[in-house]
Amino acid sequence: MPSCAGLAVPYVPFQQDAPKKYAQSEALSNGTLFPGLNLPFHLKTEGSSLPSTPLTELQALEFVLLELGIYLDTHPDDAEAFTLFKQYAAMEKAAKAAYESKFGPLTKSAAASGERYSWLQEPWPWNYEQNEVK
């Protein structure tokens, strides 16, 4: 980090094309897909480890999609990032369909696709740990 970038003063480095990327679960834990943007504010803390559940895996995929979308907003000509975005979009779509078929709908609009309205049925998505209800 440049010496002119004080920790209490907002500073965001310019992203270069094809920046390094965290793995999806590590990105979710650190709050950014890009290690170059993982800057300290006062004290640097390492990302916490999240439990490995189907829901956190889906959340990690969705987080990476959001981060890549923001990156592509400022780098629309980065073909490698766009290819990666399309790959993650397909992975997220498949993971969401698999999750909802096993555990039930994640959104109210998904509850409309079943045989009957199933939004308020327990267990809730956050009550699952490693495919079992806690």
List the model feature ranges, each with a label.
Residues 1-49, 53, 103-134:
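Long, non-catalytic architectural segments outside compact domain cores
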Residues 54, 58-72, 88, 92-95:
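Non-transmembrane amphipathic alpha-helical segments
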Residues 79-89, 113:
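Short, charged, amphipathic alpha-helical segments
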Residues 91-106:
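Amphipathic alpha-helical coiled-coil segments
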